[in-house]
Each structure stands twice: as C-alpha cells, then as structure tokens.
C-alpha cells in the first residue's frame, strides 16, 4: 500500500453512487483520487493534476441509450496525456464496445489497458494494480 500513496487516479462516472463507491475503494487502498461527473470536468482535472490512471465509465450520459462518451473521453486522454493508463468500466458492455476499447485504432493506439463490467468490480483493485505495474 505504501506505493499507492504516490499514485493519483481519476474516476469519471455520471452516477454519484458509483463515483462514491469507486473512489472510496481506491482511497481505502491509499490512492490519491479525484472524481469527475462529466468529460468536461475530467478534462479540467487533467489540466490541474498529473494522473497515473483514469477509471472511466463508458456511458457518461445515463439517459442516452448507446451513449459511449467514455470511449470518446479515453481517446482525448490518449491524445493529450499519453502516459495516463486507462481502465474502462460499464454496466452496459457489448462485444462491439469491448472491441472498440481493446483493439488498436488507425494510429495503432489502444484506448484502454483493461475493460471491466460493473458487475465484476470485486476484481477492480487487482486489475488497477496490474495496469499500474505495466511499463
């Protein structure tokens, strides 16, 4: 846990309960955590802090079926902060969404180091540790 105190994680989810739950888990493990409820607030935090990892909900506008604002945000983060590791989380995973997140784009970039359905959050801390250990 000592190393975690130096790691800063950005949690982005439009649902307050999820932001609270995810940030609470990470804070309990000793991570520094900042939370955002939208792509705009996430980008503002990226201008303020240096993050090791961003944990992004894929569907950042809950009221819009098929919304994938989190994928768009992941792409922007890759562009402006290429060193930030990205883990996507969602309650609405589809094979197409997973493919978009994990396969290289036209420039050879992969949007996310990992993709976690929200019903598998028990493995979240282990996945984050593994992703942060990647060089």
What is each PLM-predicted segment?
Residues 10, 23, 34-53, 61:
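Acidic, metal-coordinating helix/loop segments flanking the phosphotransfer/catalytic sites
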Residues 47-49, 76-84:
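Conserved phosphotransfer cores of two-component systems
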Residues 6, 30-32, 83, 109-112:
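A generic structural signal for alpha->beta connector loops
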Residues 68, 72, 76, 92-117, ...:
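Alpha4 helix (beta4-alpha4-beta5 surface) of REC/receiver domains from two-component response regulators
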Residues 16-34:
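Two-component/phosphorelay signaling modules centered on CheY-like receiver
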